[in-house]
Amino acid sequence: MLADQFKRKIDYLRVSVTDRCDLRCTYCMAEDVTFLPRQEVLTIEEIIKLIDVFNELGVKKFRLTGGEPLVRKNIISVIEHLFELKKQDKILEHTLTTNGTNLEKYSQILKNNGINRINVSLDSLNPEKYKEITKWGKLEKVINGIHSAINEGIKVKINTVLTQDLSLIH
């Protein structure tokens, strides 16, 4: 069993599966960011091995994050593996934090592989402000993805980054 310096049990792990993202949010990433070379990023097999090791050490909850996890090639293999662990009662939960741009495409696959809740990063409901924050994101695509997830029975929590120039009007 893993424990922190105060002897509290560690049963949750956040796994960043990529540093890549299909948006360039002003508070997160510069437009000209240099991504890690592919050879320095964990392979899907290495991520699965890491999950298995931490599961054996007592971690029962996993959250996939990024960058944007749904742009990671073969990420569904990781989600399928987590679902297999869940079906074997080895883990309690696996979730995902996403910007929502690919959610409409993946909602049914996520639900079919045991994802019951997700966090969606959404910083404005104003299409122009959203595009300004994300550089080229389309708010409608994210909203459609959120509706798709909800229609699949996935619980959706919205994360918003409050910035100094963010007006309550937005």
Residue ranges and their predicted role:
Residues 112-117:
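Glycine-enriched alpha-helix->loop->beta-strand junction motifs that scaffold or abut catalytic
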Residues 169-170:
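Conserved small/polar residues in nucleotide/adenosyl-binding loops
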Residues 134-151:
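Glycine-rich S-adenosyl-L-methionine
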